[in-house]
Amino acid sequence: MLALWVLAVALVAYFLCLSIYRLFLHPLANIPGPKLCALTGWYEVFWDIVVGGQFTFKIEEWHKTYGPVMRIGPNEVHFNDPDFYNELYTTTAAYQKPAEWRYRFGFGSALFDTVDHEHHAKRRAPLAAFFSRSKILEFSPFIQEQTDLLVQRIQEYEGQVICANEAFDALTMDIIGYYAFGLSYRSIDYPKFQAPCNHVTEDVARMVHTGAHFPWVFTILRSIPQAIVSLLAPPMKKIFKFNEEIAAQIRRILKNRVNLDQEKNFHRTIFHEILNSKLDPSELTQERLQMEAGSLVGAALETSKMTTALAIYYILAQPDVEKKLREELRTAMPDPGKILSVPELEQLPYLAACIREALRLAIGVSQRIRRYNPHAPTQYKNYTIPPNTVFGMCHWEQLRDARVWDRPYEFLPERWLANNGNPLALNGQPLAKYFVPFHRGPRGCLGKEMGMAQLNIGLATLFRRVDHLELFETDQSAVDIVADYFVPLCVKGSKGVRVLVK
C-alpha cells in the first residue's frame, strides 16, 4: 500500500515539474498560445480524434487571439503570416519531417512519409522524372481518351442524376492506375461510376489522426487476419484487394527486371522507374514498392475528386460563370469533337481562372505542413525558434487569408483576370505569390502536372460536349470543408455534387 502512495506522489511530482518546465522554463515559453497546447499534445488528440478533424480550425481561431506566431504543442510552433510562407518553405531548405508522423497513413517507407531530407531527395528523384511535365504531356492523349469515355458515359445518363465526385474518382483511378502501375481498372464502366475505389480514400483518411498519434494501431491491424479486419472495417476489404493486385503486378515486374532496359513496347510504371534507379537494393523490395503505390493512389484520388467536383459545383451554381466558360470553350473549339492539347487549354484565360479558383478553395492538403530544422534556429521577426522545434503553416489559411484575398470564401474566377492577367493581392503583392495549392519547396506535390492536365482536359471536355447540366438537390454543403484529415473532407454522409444530365 505504501508503495502505491509513493508511486502516486512521484507521478504527481513528475507531472507538476513537467508542467512548470513547459509553461515557464521551456525555450518556447515566450511564444504566445493556449496553455493547454503548451502543456500537452493530448489537446490536439482531443480535437482531431475525439471531436474529429478540428484542430486545424482551432489553430485558425486561436491565431485571431494570439497573433501570427503561436505555440500549438509542447515543442511545436505555428505561423500565420502569408508573407512568411515562401521564406519558410524555400526550395533549398533541408528540413526534416517529424518522425512521429511517419506512420499516419500506414505507409512508413513510402516517399511521402520519408523523414530525412536527403533520403527523401533520393527517393523522389526517379518519381520526379516520371511525373515531369514532359512525361505527362506525352501521356496526355491517354488522359483525353479516358475523359472522352467518361463524358460519353455521362451523356448516356441523359435525364438521370450522377455524382460528379464518383465520376471523377473513377476517372482518376483509371488514369493513375494505368500510368503509374500499368493496370486497367475500368472504373468508369461501373453503373453510374460507383466503382470499388469510391470513398476508399475518405475512409482511410478518417484514420489518419489515429495513425499519427497511435502508430501501433496499424501494427495491430497488420497482425490480424485480413478476413477479420474486413468484417470489423468493411472499407478495408477494397484496400486489401487493391494491395493484392499491386503485389501481383510488382511480382511480374520483379521477375522480368533483368530486361528492363530493353523493354520498348511495354508501358513503363513507377515500379520500373524505381527499380532502374540508383537507389540502394534495400529500397527495391516488394513491400516498399507496395507502400509507394498505396501512398500515390491515396494522394491522387481524394484531391483530384474534390477539386474537380468543387469546380463543377461552383460553375453550375453561378450561371454567369458557366456562360462565360462555355462561350470561351465554344470559341476556342468550334468542333466539340476536337479538344485542344493541354498547353493550348492552359492559354484559355477563363478556364485557367476557374481551375485556379477550384484549386484555391479545394486546398489539396488541409493539415499544417510540419517540419523542423535540426541544425539551426528559425527566425521570425523578434522570435527565435530553437533547432529541433517543429514548425508549420496551413494551406487552409494561406489560400483564404483575408489580408490577401478579396472575398476569400467566394468562387471568383474574375480575380485572376484583373490587371491584364497579373492580379494583385489586397496588400499590393502579386497574387501568384500566395497561390500554393501544390505546396512549395523540395517536398512540393509530385503530381502537380498530372493534376493540372486532368483538370484542364476534364473540365474542358465536360463543358464543351455536355450542353445541359444542372445541380440536383445539391447546395454548398457538398463542397464546404468541415474537417481536416490531412486532406479536407466535407460533411460526413454527404451525397456529393449531384448533377442532372439534361
UniProtKB/Swiss-Prot annotation:
Its pathway is:
Mycotoxin biosynthesis
The record's function comment reads:
Cytochrome P450 monooxygenase; part of the gene cluster that mediates the biosynthesis of brefeldin A (BFA), a protein transport inhibitor that shows antiviral, antifungal, and antitumor properties. The proposed biosynthesis of BFA involves formation of an acyclic polyketide chain that is differentially tailored throughout the backbone.
Swiss-Prot/TrEMBL induction comment: Coexpressed with the other cluster genes on brefeldin A production optimized medium.
User: Which GO BP terms apply?
Assistant: mycotoxin biosynthetic process
List the keywords (alphabetical).
Answer: Glycoprotein, Heme, Iron, Membrane, Metal-binding, Monooxygenase, Oxidoreductase, Transmembrane, Transmembrane helix
Instruction: Name the needed cofactors.
Output: heme
Family under the similarity heading: Belongs to the cytochrome P450 family.
Describe its membrane topology: Single-pass membrane protein
Enzyme Commission number(s) of this protein: 1.-.-.-
- Main location, first listed in the record: membrane
Highest taxon of the lineage: Eukaryota
InterPro entries per the record?
Cyt_P450, Cyt_P450_CS, Cyt_P450_E_grp-I, Cyt_P450_sf, Cytochrome_P450_monoxygenase
One cellular component term (GO) for this entry is: membrane
> Can you say what this protein is called?
Cytochrome P450 monooxygenase orf6
Q: Which residues are glycosylated?
A: N382
Compartments, as annotated in UniProt? Membrane
